[in-house]
């Protein structure tokens, strides 16, 4: 089985390559061939990167379809994970990777006649809900038209529509979509700090806030999952050639008190959503930090997902709780952890 992982050096991509290497080792199945595609090569001396054959392709480039087609030839599945969260002040640059890049991957899958494509969607693709709406978990049939004030959500929703069209035009290709909650792991600490807090904020900040309370709006209720558990879901989707959409999230649902505990803080105090959104907007416009207010809208507006289908069809279960996944990330902040073979890109 030849599996190509596009975007194989990021938070999730590294975990997927690691899981595929483990599947080959645990099962003694040396026929599993892992091919990594990234914008730049990782350090092949670091695990798990040495377990894959590598190609460098910019998925948003004008020649991406031709280059990806050549890489995809003879593959049994393509797992598409490439994504750009930065620069948040330049949406066309993000669009080039996120939406144009996905269109290029799908076109190359069709041209190379790959039998399955697995695409990283997200809880962020779903239509938003209010506070009361978070009381009822939704399944994979919930509309995927996104949250209109969040660039990330807009791009994920656009890709869902692109996959709908691709699926209709190419019925012989198995199209699989994973829609995970927020994805955490220890080694992603430097990447996540750079993407959401900025490099002006030291990673050791978690050591300074333990005697503080966490100010958050009440609607900040969302799900998370460990990167290794998401990677396991990707492997199971490929191994079983499972079609359709799958919600991926661990228990329990995270809320302000649980978030405060994970950060080792004294507790949480409720503040108005409008206040936090305003602070984030001003500091983002002043370029003091890289997170735009759309991420506040995502945290406050995404629905809570049911994961029954992943359990029944994929046989998937989270091995880590959402709190364990977040605590691992927090520990990574304190230790300055980073993916060893692929440093975080700066926006």
Question: How would you label these PLM feature ranges?
Answer:
Residues 167-221:
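NAD(P)-dependent short-chain dehydrogenase/reductase
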Residues 57-100, 108:
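NAD(P)H-binding glycine-rich loop region in Rossmannoid oxidoreductase-like domains
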Residues 227, 256-257, 284-317:
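Conserved C-terminal active-site "lid" loop/helix of NAD(P)H-dependent oxidoreductases
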Residues 221, 230-291, 327-330, 336-346:
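Mid/C-terminal beta-alpha module of Rossmann-like enzyme folds, strongest
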Residues 147-176:
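Active-site Tyr-X1-5-Lys
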Residues 1-29:
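N-terminal Rossmann NAD(P)H-binding glycine-rich loop of SDR-like oxidoreductase domains
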Residues 100, 104-152:
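Conserved Rossmann-fold NAD(P)-dependent oxidoreductase catalytic core, especially the SDR/UDP-sugar
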């Amino acid at each position: 089985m030849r599996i190509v992982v596009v975007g194989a050096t990021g938070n999730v991509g590294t975990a997927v390559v690691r899981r595929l290497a483990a599947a080959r080792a645990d099962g003694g199945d040396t026929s599993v061939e892992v091919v990594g595609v990234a914008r730049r090569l990782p350090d092949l001396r670091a695990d798990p990167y040495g377990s894959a054959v590598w190609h460098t392709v910019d998925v948003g480039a004008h020649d991406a379809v031709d280059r990806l087609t050549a890489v995809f030839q003879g593959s049994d599945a393509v797992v598409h994970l490439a994504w750009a969260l930065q620069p948040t002040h330049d949406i066309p640059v993000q669009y080039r990777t996120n939406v144009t890049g996905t269109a290029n991957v799908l076109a190359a899958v069709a041209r190379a006649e790959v039998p399955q494509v697995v695409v990283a969607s997200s809880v962020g693709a779903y239509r938003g809900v209010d506070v009361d709406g978070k009381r009822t978990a939704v399944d994979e049939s919930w509309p995927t038209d996104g949250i209109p004030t969040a660039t990330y959500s807009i791009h994920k929703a656009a890709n869902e529509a692109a996959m709908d069209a691709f699926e209709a035009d190419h019925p012989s290709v198995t199209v699989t979509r994973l829609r995970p909650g927020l994805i955490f792991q220890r080694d992603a600490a430097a990447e996540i700090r750079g993407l959401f807090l900025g490099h002006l904020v030291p990673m050791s900040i978690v050591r300074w806030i333990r005697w503080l309370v966490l100010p958050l709006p009440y609607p900040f209720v969302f799900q998370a999952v460990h990167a290794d558990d998401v990677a396991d879901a990707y492997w199971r989707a490929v191994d079983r050639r499972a079609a359709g959409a799958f919600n991926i999230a661990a228990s329990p649902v995270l809320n302000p008190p649980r978030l405060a505990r994970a950060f080792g803080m004294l507790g949480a105090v409720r503040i108005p959503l409008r206040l936090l959104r305003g602070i984030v907007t001003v500091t983002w416009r002043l370029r003091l930090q890289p997170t735009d207010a759309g991420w506040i809208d995502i945290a406050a507006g995404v629905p809570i997902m049911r994961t029954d289908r992943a359990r029944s069809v994929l046989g998937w279960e989270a091995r880590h709780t959402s709190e364990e996944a977040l605590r691992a990330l927090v520990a990574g902040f304190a230790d300055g952890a980073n993916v060893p073979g692929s440093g975080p890109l700066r926006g």
